[in-house]
């Protein structure tokens, strides 16, 4: 007799949908549990069996929490804007609006086949104008805000304007002007100053340009697309940026508030990259015509300043043309052109050959003015990091060492150590060769020497102690069609303004030609009627911004919209936000450890500053599921032909088999290979469960109204205890193993005690909900078990009356026996000697020593 899974699963999926079984009562007085999956990008390929792993894990926990009396919010939606969707549309020749809808429909169908308990009434898509209305609203708030360094929070740009009107730029780390000068600035001059403070601003910067994709990529995106075979080069462009760096300290500090995997916390810390050091200027031998007096650098090793033998400026640094002598101009320009064809990843490759060109210019070392230092350009220095220039200390930095060896530059050791074949970097050795008429740090350790150099530089007003971050501002604009339109308008007067909030959403126009232009201009530039905009307050005619937002924009705040998805006035009702935030559990791939998680934390902190949310962090607990590999133990890929489609697995074995197997494969966070034989094994287990409740035919359901025996209650409550412990800890594999032990214990028996087996059905329900619902119904219950109380273990049945004692002879395991829990030493040794196997070993031997470890083992030492 086989479990009729097709019939059962079809019935219950339809039942849950018709009865809206998993709709959240958002205003419930029950304790809340917000369980969230990272919503998927709906690709044309659909799901493979790796996708349901995380979804099944959150579903088990959501079902468990409902049965524990929680009001559960467990939604699903679609991250559907962005480059992948547009590329798919270009490959198929079908408009992305159509392909995206078709892909979403397919994803939804596949997800619903798995029996996941989502509240589909809250389904959302980032491409829905009712959704991106508020993505655009958040953008406008960012544009109209600045970060007050004194308060360490965002404020309205109007507060900054008031400050300038009252006291000028006094107290800010900015070029100084007074209130009268501010009032006399033109509107364009004022806007340029405000742009230096806005959380959204435009800048002419070297960007990662991909010709094949026709767009720029954020630094964090380059590795992914280069890995896919696309060429990415550096190209100067005027781009919209988000000042995420203003929040660097808070992004770092508030990692203490969350329960995330240590590896993810470390990745975020490293990406933010906080470091303390010295910012100092190395003066030119004579000032430049522009008035520039020197090259500013930042170093975390002020103690090595006497070891500087050359300086390096990034090839794309704006001062390169100024500092290059006529004799070196051709070589420098050729090198700049060559380096622009390389991505940052290529340039930062540690093992690559070092290249560079001398600019013809010299500076002197401020700590030792007698030292004349040549200034080079080299692509191992990036303009986007630090100041875009470095002081090179080849004796104590490996890249500088290799560069110096390549070009025959001096290598001066200033820290005790061996540098014959490689740079020697140490913070424990003392300084040598570090003395001049200005200052001496010889004999000092790293801490003392660095402190002395910083104090000296500050007293001379040539440098200052500074905290630096590796984190760069977020490159926000994309020269693509399929994204949220940026709600800004550029006017001939030189001023840029957002459209009125009452005009949101700014809807993406329906263009038939959506391919990139190849010129760096967005396809939206072709929407002539859409481009022109008349300012409702001034009547001035302007041009809309044609770049679109990156894919990450919509995913920065979607967790808030699930709480209140139909609200047309605000992104989320404040009362509901206070009740439901933060997200209790967030599950998704570790590939999002930096990008999505960092961007969403940034937006959330901004929303916290303006009072739109009540929590400092969006996601309390984070779990990363491990990859499921193909049966060949390689990552699933169409090109490798090892993709397993969940549709096929469900068709042959059922959704409960897929769910159980993926949770039984091993710990959730581990990488695991797919196994068809493993699915077959789990399918056999479900059939054994079915037969446990049926005697002979599909209609012969059996539960007996008999009192359970103490042994039956022991195995039940041991199982209850184990499952209750394992589900919150995501130890689903061991919980399922315990359910299997239960079935093994009961299968040989002819007894089917109702009280015991009904509890087992409830224990099974989070893992295999279809079969559990069917068995519950067949037991005579009129309601779905989704909200039944989850079983609790009775402590009296968890106490073991017997213990297992192992028997060793000369330290080798020979046998074991059960004994009363309070067995005495003499009785335990006697019982061990009377075991048949032990009697045989002891025959003719002398027992020299008897050892008893209470409750664990007997060891007999014989001669």
From Swiss-Prot:
InterPro entries noted in UniProt: aa-tRNA-synth_I_CS (IPR001412), aa-tRNA-synth_Ia (IPR002300), Leu-tRNA-ligase (IPR002302), Leu_tRNA-synth_edit (IPR025709), M/V/L/I-tRNA-synth_anticd-bd (IPR013155), Rossmann-like_a/b/a_fold (IPR014729), tRNAsynth_Ia_anticodon-bd (IPR009080), Val/Leu/Ile-tRNA-synth_edit (IPR009008)
Similarity section: Belongs to the class-I aminoacyl-tRNA synthetase family.
Residues that, per the record, bind ATP: 638
Short motif ('KMSKS' region): ranges: 635-639
Pfam families from the UniProt entry: Anticodon_1, tRNA-synt_1, tRNA-synt_1_2
EC number(s) per entry: 6.1.1.4
Reaction it catalyzes: tRNA(Leu) + L-leucine + ATP = L-leucyl-tRNA(Leu) + AMP + diphosphate
GO molecular function annotations of the record: aminoacyl-tRNA deacylase activity; ATP binding; leucine-tRNA ligase activity
Protein name: Leucine--tRNA ligase
GO BP terms, alphabetized: leucyl-tRNA aminoacylation
Signal peptide: none
Stored SUPFAM superfamilies: Anticodon-binding domain of a subclass of class I aminoacyl-tRNA synthetases, Nucleotidylyl transferase, ValRS/IleRS/LeuRS editing domain
Example of a GO cellular component annotation carried by this entry: cytosol
Alphabetized UniProt keyword annotations: Aminoacyl-tRNA synthetase, ATP-binding, Cytoplasm, Ligase, Nucleotide-binding, Protein biosynthesis
Major place of residence: cytoplasm
Top-level taxonomic group: Bacteria
Residue interval(s) of motif 'HIGH' region: 40-51
Listed Gene3D superfamilies: 3.10.20.590, HUPs, Isoleucyl-tRNA Synthetase, Domain 1
Location relative to the cell: Cytoplasm
